[in-house]
Amino acid sequence: MSAEKQKYGVHSEAGKLRKVMVCSPGLAHKRLTPSNCDELLFDDVIWVDQAKRDHFDFVTKMRERGVDVLEMHNLLTDIVQQPEALKWILDRKITSDTVGVGLTNEVRSWLEGLEPRHLAEFLIGGVAGQDLPVSEGAEVIKMYNKYLGHSSFILPPLPNTQFTRDTTCWIYGGVTLNPMYWPARRQETLLTTAIYKFHKEFTGADFQVWYGDPDKDHGNATLEGGDVMPVGKGIVLIGMGERTSRHAIGQLAQNLFEKGAAEKIIVAGLPKSRAAMHLDTVFSFCDRDLVTVFPEVVKEIKPFIITPDSSKPYGMNIAPQDASFLEVVSEQLLGKKDKLRVVETGGNSFAAEREQWDDGNNVVALEPGVVIGYDRNTYTNTLLRKAGIEVITISAGELGRGRGGGHCMTCPIVRDPIDY
């Protein structure tokens, strides 16, 4: 008799966090320079050794609270030892479109000859002209280095893997494989998909794929996990702004409704700006009924509700809401008698804008009433503590340079529901 598969899924934003995936800073971050960090979506270069220490502290503090933390480099190291998994990755990652005609065989051969840990590091960290021995591709590599420079990338690095929240999102009993907005991030989804497809942590688990396929061109449909929050009661909050498009939201809603995975989507129409690139940069749950928000953006959110309706075109009803976003979320979760408690970004207008920029509202809940946030957001952390929230702090000096806090740096895989 076969063992019953473990059920994976995320059923709230503040219930007990059981299992999570992270990605430590590494080679990809050592590739960041003042001339390329903007293209790679970082605001500045980072001190990588310190960032690694700070990230280890982040992981340690989660583990101390009983969270099973999976690290992406380790997961990739495991699966590239499987010939089938390695072939699946390289067939998609090393092509004429990605590395150019004349280098596919050479780059692939070189990668296949690496030790598994080094191979995993290069899959995330990218391959520069100086990495590949001249003996591999001889004349082509010599020409490449001469005209493009030793630091030019044959495969670009993926430093934003640090923000595992975005590439996939677990919604109740399944997961989405997200088509990312920026080209600099699209290869991240491929690697995460490989982990779900081949790693024993996931091959022995029970879950469904709701949406997305890294082998498919999704066109204008883009979806990122920082915009997606399964909050409970069959409700999913989805931000629609800079990174997540209406095209993807509509398709995801259809799929969730058809499979009975969700009952209602609350869409948050966000202003398009880097400071509010995702919903979780201005709004996150800290407890069953407490959220932290950046009011300057949240008050501008235009909410509407999508519900299944077989009498409507495409099987859905879309209803704009007159009430504010916070009022809509509060009523849908708590009913009309209770209201969400709201902690706004702290300090005067200057301090609040600075703390939002430094991810003061981007905290991750480990259980109801316990969150991890950046130490530098002293005003907001103080207000959260006064509201009864335990705030565990980590250093923001290096980790925050890519514009992401504890919420962004975690991809919850198993999280308990909350009783509403």
From Swiss-Prot:
Q: What GO cellular component entries does it have?
A: cytoplasm
Q: Where in the cell is it found?
A: Cytoplasm
The record lists the catalysed reaction(s) as: L-arginine + H2O = L-citrulline + NH4(+)
GO MF term set: arginine deiminase activity
State the similarity comment. Answer: Belongs to the arginine deiminase family.
Pathway entry:
Amino-acid degradation; L-arginine degradation via ADI pathway; carbamoyl phosphate from L-arginine: step 1/2
**Which keywords does this chain's UniProt record carry?**
Arginine metabolism, Cytoplasm, Hydrolase
Biological-process GO terms, alphabetical: arginine catabolic process to ornithine; arginine deiminase pathway
The protein's matches in HAMAP family, at most eight in alphabetical order, are given as:
Arg_deiminase
Question: What does the annotation say about its assembly with partners?
Answer: Homodimer.
UniProt xrefs under SUPFAM superfamilies: Pentein (SSF55909)
Stated regulation of activity:
Activated by Mg(2+) or Mn(2+) and strongly inhibited by Zn(2+).
The active-site annotation reads 408 (amidino-cysteine intermediate)
The protein depicted here goes by the name Arginine deiminase
Pfam families per record = ADI (PF02274)
